[in-house]
Swiss-Prot record:
EC number: 2.5.1.25
Cellular compartment(s): Nucleus
Species annotation: Xenopus tropicalis (Western clawed frog)
Pfam family of the protein (one): DTW
Reactions mediated catalytically: a uridine in tRNA + S-adenosyl-L-methionine = a 3-[(3S)-3-amino-3-carboxypropyl]uridine in tRNA + S-methyl-5'-thioadenosine + H(+)
Chain ranges for the short sequence motif DXTW as given in the UniProt record: 202-205
Stored InterPro entries: DTW, tRNA_Mod/Golgi_Maint
Protein name: tRNA-uridine aminocarboxypropyltransferase 1
Biological role: Catalyzes the formation of 3-(3-amino-3-carboxypropyl)uridine (acp3U) at position 20 in the D-loop of several cytoplasmic tRNAs (acp3U(20)).
Gene Ontology CC terms, in alphabetical order: nucleus
Amino acid sequence: MSHEKSESCLQEKKHSSSFERFHDGTSLENNLLQNLKLSSQRVLEIAQKKGRSKCPKCNSSRMFYCYTCFVPVESVPSDEIPVVKLPLKIDIIKHPNETDGKSTAVHAKLLAHEDVTVYTYPCVPQYQDQKHEVVLVFPGPDSVSLSDSLLYIRGSGDMQNDSSCEPSLKRPKCSQQYDKSKNEGVEEKKPMHFLKKLIFIDSTWNQTNKIISDERLQGLQQVELMERKTCFWRHQKGTPNTYLSTIEAIYYFMIDYHTIILQKDYKGEYDDLLFFFSFMYRIINDAKKSAGKL
């Protein structure tokens, strides 16, 4: 996703108040990092003082984590890094020219490693047999809101279940059946159970066209996150501040899914997705203040 920043993000506070103000539409960028419920970042503070450290896999010198091996460096014990369990699987398709060290896709893999897979384009999975359970989170002329995508997901699921549901090598056999005749006049409380996987594109915006136009992604419903403003510190000129970094897009989608689809109160379950992001933001923001740039 794009590399964008907000000019007025405030510093994050550990273990602070709930995330209620995220949905009131006011001062969104001001509230993001100060309202997170994060695990202790003491391990990152210690690592910062030590400086760069070796990757345990490739021996490269890195700060905090290795962005090519997707593991913490030796100075950051892996058991002190939070693990976030996501309700959906995530595929991240990264542009080959995307600078690994500038990408936030690695944050998702580090913090939710069981639920996140990163592919480097042109390596793209086949999704044609999974259209009824996959959405592409990407803004565009055909993108819809998360709520509106319910109609597409349900419709595709109905058509899939009406046909012979034979197992294939690419997709496990159908485990859920949806009998529309039995549900006429009955409101579906959780119709998004069809949704199993999200696709995110990790790229600067001027490089996304090649990936988004790939035939393997055609026919997938696109979902756009509305009214969210980025706090990413790498501003890409000419794009609106609603164009989010990859980790921000994943984070916001999970909150929307949790509150809109699962209809549960959000209590910070996914805040640790911004564990590295918020800490790095604070470092960069402090450096800008010291240099008189803020």
